Amino acid sequence: MTIGLVYAMPGEIETLLTDETRTPIRTEAGVSFYQIRPHTIACCCGVSKVNAAMGAQLLISLYHPDLVLNAGVAGCFENVPIGTIVLAEGFVQHDVDTTAIGDPVGLVSTVNQIRFPTADLPAAKAAMDATGVPYRTGWVATGDWFATDTPRSHWIADTFHPLLCEMEGCAVAQVCLRNGVKFMAIKSVSDCLFEHHDFAFNSPAAMKDLNRVVMAFLTQLTKE
């Protein structure tokens, strides 16, 4: 199985890289690709939906992965410890709004979907269980907006009922759907939206164990 990993920020991918893998094997359109291990390629694409979609499509077109996994940090709508690991059940895009022409909010008309579930959730949960790492499962809201404790955050929570909010995941999910590639995601909580946590201060703590969990998860998922 060939696996592709999509990260947004250098800080998210940093702990995945070693002296042997730190040099990109190629860079296309500003997206750097790294050979993490045999049959595992990672890319760092930049923050936001367009960057995430571009990185995911390049990854798929260049390396033809069987599975794409998006990993990174996210804000949480619940008050949970920083660094809590979340296995995503699926994604929505909170900033897609064509209600003016009669569509339900969040509808991506190209694929006629609001909700983008991740692939093989029972197998993913079994793999995560086998790592022994405590984790949550939940839905994730994606949009080109850094979430804070504002009326919009409350609207997202009330409308889509997600556990997390971030800026890339659903874009990757949509690209995978259109390419017929399986998609999964693992997130680490960097801040709690209604608790006024400092994202910049907490991000290193959120990223600290993320890639240890990602690699343990993939090892379990790909066991024969």
Identify the meaning behind each predicted range.
Residues 1-63:
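N-terminal short beta-loop-beta anion/metal-coordinating cradle
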Residues 41-47, 139-141, 186:
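Active-site-proximal beta-strand elements of phosphoester/diester hydrolases
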Residues 64-69:
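Proline-aspartate-enriched helix->loop->beta-strand connector
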Residues 74-160:
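Mid-sequence, gly/pro-rich, charge-dense loop/helix-turn segments that line enzyme active sites
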Residues 193-224:
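His/Asp/Glu-rich mid-to-C-terminal helical/loop segments that flank catalytic regions of hydrolases
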